[in-house]
Every structure is written in C-alpha cells, then in structure tokens.
Amino acid sequence: MNEVLAKGKRAKEVARELVLKSTHQKNEALAAIANQLISETAYILEENKRDIEEGKAKGFSDSLLDRLMLNEQRIVDMTEGIKQLIELRDPVGECVSAWERPNGLSIQEMRVPLGVVGMIYEARPNVTVDAATICLKTGNAVILRGSSSAIHSNKAIVAVIHRALKQTSLPEESVQLIEDTTRDSAKQLFTMNDYLDVLIPRGGKQLIDTVVREASVPVLETGAGNCHIFIDETADKQMAFDIIINAKTQRPSVCNAIETIVLHENWAQQYGSELFSSLKERGVELRGDQKALAMDSSIVLASEEDWGTEFLSLTLAVKIVSSIEEAIHHINTYGSMHSEAIISENEENVSKFFVSVDAAALYHNASTRFTDGSEFGFGAEIGISTQKLHVRGPMGLPALTSTKYIIRGNGQIRK
C-alpha cells in the first residue's frame, strides 16, 4: 500500500478514536503542541532556512518567499493562535436545535466532527499548524499535503506535533503529512472517497481550480482573492485614500488584499491623479483602462487578463466607471466572490451594492483586509470559503463539523 492510501486508512481509524475525546483532552493536546513549537523553534527555523535557500535558487518571487518564510515572531504568533484556540468553545456535541413531536419523540440536532479532513496547500508553513490544530479542536483527523517549496518546514512542524501528541491521550496519527509532493500523490488524494470526508485546497487560483475540477471527494473551496474596492462619487477623499492604501500595500501577498480599484468617473476627475501618485510613491504598479491612462500617462494599459488576475504583489488594476451599475457589473464579471468593498456616503448605493454583488464578504467604508477568522471574532479559521454550500466566508470551528439527529422515544412505532 502506498503512502497516501496507508495514511488515509489510518486517518479513518484515528477519526473513530478522536470522536470519543473530551474537550479537555483536545485542549491538553493543543497546549502540548504550542509548548513543543516554542521549545523546538531553532529546529523548525533551520529546516525553514533550507526551503528559503532552495526557493531563492529557483528564483521564487519576493511575495512567495515572504509566504514561505518563518521567524521567531511568526512561530510565537502561531502559538498565540493555538492558545486562543484553546479558549474557544468546542462546537462538537453542541445542540443546534431541539424539539418534541406530537407523538412524544424528542429530536435534537447535534454537532459532530466531519471525520477526516484533507488539506492541500501551497507555500505557507503556518497553514500546517493552523490546519492541524483546528482539526484537532473539532475532533477531526487531518491529512496534510503541502507543496514541495515548503517540504522541509512542513516535515519539521509535523515531527514537532507528533512529539507533542506522544505526551497526550490523542493518537500521534491524528495529524499526518503526505511527504510525496509529486502531482501523482495530489491526484490520489483527490479521489480518496473511502477515507476522506472533505478536501480543502488553500492556495492560488490554479491549485484551487485543479482541485475543484478533478476531485471526486467533497471539496470546500477556499477561493482566490480577486478583490475590488468601488469608490462611489460621494466617497470621502481621505477615507478612500486610507482604505485603498491599506487594502493594497499592508500585505499584498494575501488573499484579502485588493487587486482592482473601481473609481466613479466624477470622483476620479477630482482625486484620481493624487490617488495614483500616492500609490506609486508606495511602489504600486498601476494597470488601467483608457480613461485611467488619460488621467496619468504612466499607467500601463490593462489587458483583459489583468482584470481577472490575483496579482498577490504591488500591482493594482484601475477601472473608471460612469455608474454604480457599471461598477457592480465589472465586479461580478471578474471578481472571485471573496471580498468586495464600497466607499460611499450614499446609503441607497450601498444597499444596491450589498444586494447585487455576489461575494462572501461585502464591506462599506472599510478595508477588505478584515476578511479573516480572527478579525471576525472566530478566533481561528481553516480558510476562506468562496462557495455557497456548507459554509461561506472565513471558516471557523463550526465549519469543520456536520450534524446528526438524536431521536429519543419510549416505544413509538410508525403507523
């Protein structure tokens, strides 16, 4: 039996053990993992350095190297996230609803773990910790399949997690890593219906599209973030400047950063040139339509492909429109249903935007950078879903559960 099948089979067995573990036992395991990560920081950073050096040799972009890089502070941040996770309410066993039928049957809908979660992701080694700990908190076994670019970091982190779990009542194989990073191992994971209850891809558009297209197991789609901000003609100038600069430049390599600004032509005629200059001063490359070029000749003419691209860098597309209807049409045509924002003082336009734009998170007068589990108050997330079934938006702990019905009677039979 090859690695993927063997680990899938073992994960299914472990999932049956995890469902019996108490919240206290799961929290003890999380605390052990946090402590072990701190005590073995030097080992993890040493292995991460190997990934970084190999990435530089392969010519990885600065944004990719940033996603790949770990340091002491990022590991501390991971452990702080685990400590916050411990404090969160365990959704498993929660009564979602309860009622009694006229025939005396008592029915309860209870939250239960999904079972075995598969995670396939790119670069970010922190996802290894996030996925492992969130799955453990919700009583799920997890099979991790990272990319070759982070293989040394991922192997080190999972080894550390295993050493932590050995000190607890949770099985070591509650968290398993597929070390084979070839396409064949990924494709095998896509079709492991006998063992996987759900597969969650987390990465770029190409990875996510491949998983959605080829997987036969149920998929929770964490879509790419081609996010927009529409600046309505009534938008406050300073607010618009501050929000756009934050949403683009604070951390351009993440999925909730914006990739396109859509400007109402009346607002753009007054403030567009100043906004473009402010963005360029911060290293942003602008690609715009003909109307944008007429305002600033240094802007590169945007291609059709640019409108649908998640740049994940300091590149920003600029679209000038004559109405909110044109803005909504552009966003719904090219957006990835992740996060979209409107800056406006016109409540009628805000309401129209909220009703008409199809996305997981819609903002009024705020940065799209808040689409995040911790910022929403969830405390933790496994990803940000851009699909509509099961869950949408930041996926907190309840997203990794299903429900079952518990029916209690005293001898009832159906007539």
Curated annotation (Swiss-Prot):
Give me the gene this protein comes from: proA
**Catalysed reaction per UniProt?**
L-glutamate 5-semialdehyde + phosphate + NADP(+) = L-glutamyl 5-phosphate + NADPH + H(+)
Q: Where in the cell is it found?
A: Cytoplasm
Which Gene Ontology cellular-component terms appear in the entry? cytoplasm
GO function term, MF aspect, one: NADP binding
The pathway that the record names for this protein is:
Amino-acid biosynthesis; L-proline biosynthesis; L-glutamate 5-semialdehyde from L-glutamate: step 2/2
Tell me the protein's name. Answer: Gamma-glutamyl phosphate reductase
The EC code for this enzyme is: 1.2.1.41
What InterPro entries does the record tag this protein with? Ald_DH/histidinol_DH, Ald_DH_C, Ald_DH_N, Aldehyde_DH_dom, G-glutamylP_reductase_CS, Glu-5-SA_DH, GPR_dom
Q: Which GO terms describe its biological process?
A: L-proline biosynthetic process
Indicate the family of this protein. Belongs to the gamma-glutamyl phosphate reductase family.
Q: Which organism is it from?
A: Bacillus cereus (strain AH187)
Q: Function, please? A: Catalyzes the NADPH-dependent reduction of L-glutamate 5-phosphate into L-glutamate 5-semialdehyde and phosphate. The product spontaneously undergoes cyclization to form 1-pyrroline-5-carboxylate.
Its chief place of residence is: cytoplasm
Disulfide linkage: none
